[in-house]
């Protein structure tokens, strides 16, 4: 007779409700929608819930259908790769295996005076594997992006108070 035993490790879904995480030196907020999508972000973020506007008039910026280039294409391509590498490096091999080809969406808020990233917001479903990743991992991603990513802005981009930049990444 052959006996087979499996080890089952309990996992914690950290993001089952809207709540605030008081961590070691930082605070994160999880806002959960009825759709089960959630936004996870540092409470010190200044642009969450705001819309980009023109510095000179305060008028809300709306991207036209034809598009307007707000950053240079070269810097966007370079920084997209940097963000992908930062996200890839943040997760352990076991976490990547659990995530298994599912993407995570990052919304970054670009400072139009410096080109640096001011704020980062993570969006995912609260029943996806990302919901089992502790806040500290997302904090490390936020800090690495803020330290290593800087966009080259166009003249049009510099007219705004900030620029949205979102991307989806599948950790490999």
Tell where the protein language model's regions lie, with residue ranges.
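Charge-biased low-complexity segments
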Residues: 11-172
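N-terminal signal peptide c-region/cleavage motif recognized by signal peptidases
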Residues: 5-7
């Amino acid at each position: 007779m052959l006996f087979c035993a499996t080890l089952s490790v309990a996992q914690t879904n950290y993001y089952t409700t809207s709540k605030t995480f008081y961590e070691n030196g930082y605070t994160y907020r999880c806002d959960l929608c009825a759709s089960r999508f959630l936004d996870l972000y540092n409470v010190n973020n200044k642009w969450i819930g705001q819309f980009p506007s023109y510095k000179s008039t305060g008028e809300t910026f709306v991207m036209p259908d034809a598009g307007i280039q707000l950053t240079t294409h070269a810097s966007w391509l370079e920084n997209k790769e940097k963000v992908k590498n930062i996200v890839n490096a943040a997760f352990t091999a076991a976490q990547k295996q659990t995530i298994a080809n599912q993407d995570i969406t990052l919304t970054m808020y670009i400072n139009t005076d410096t080109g640096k990233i001011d704020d980062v917001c993570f969006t995912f479903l609260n029943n996806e594997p990302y919901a089992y990743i502790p806040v500290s991992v997302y904090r490390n991603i936020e800090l690495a992006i803020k330290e290593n990513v800087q966009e080259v802005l166009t003249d049009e981009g510099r007219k705004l108070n900030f620029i949205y930049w979102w991307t989806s990444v599948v950790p490999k």
